[in-house]
Amino acid sequence: MKTGDNPVQQTLKKVRSCDYCRDHLPHGVRPVLQLSANSKILIVGQAPGSKVHETGIPFDDPSGDRLRAWMGVTNADFYNAEKIAILPMGFCYPGRGKSGDLPPREECAKLWRHELMGLMPSIELTLIVGQYAIAWHLSHAKQDTLTATVKRWREHWPNKLPIPHPSPRNNIWLKKNAWFETDVVPALQQRVVSILSTHS
């Protein structure tokens, strides 16, 4: 089958040319995502930040450094779409608000999410990163706070894992909730090794 006939590539081409939200994106349109029909791990984030908007590389920032450390993966594995898919709730940088980046645009999920999720039949683990991703992917089990949802991570394990956003802005949260890095991160790393070693 030619690349042009590949449903994943066809859909990615459409997504990357989407400008539906252009009037609401002060820095312009630049959808950032990666996936393959063979992806085994799915990372569901919020939306690209300013640096990622500039480079077009998902999690190419301090948040990504921490996320890769939590997962215990190399850059080579992280950016290999055959292994890891990255599908933020919003594909474009939404701009800055008074207290950080604005929330992801809701249009992305409405327009593309179900179609894209259907193109990844081999996902064994979904990392659900931050409150916006949790609200969509764990809507039935979302607790009153992100902390409460993450504390009940075993209820979704080993196929899904809600985690806080790895942004440096969450350093205080991580200090207050040391159990995350002592209990959850080692389990995550073991699961990632198990999945990737099976399919390497």
Language-model features: locations:
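A polyanion-binding, active-site-adjacent surface
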Residues: 2-196
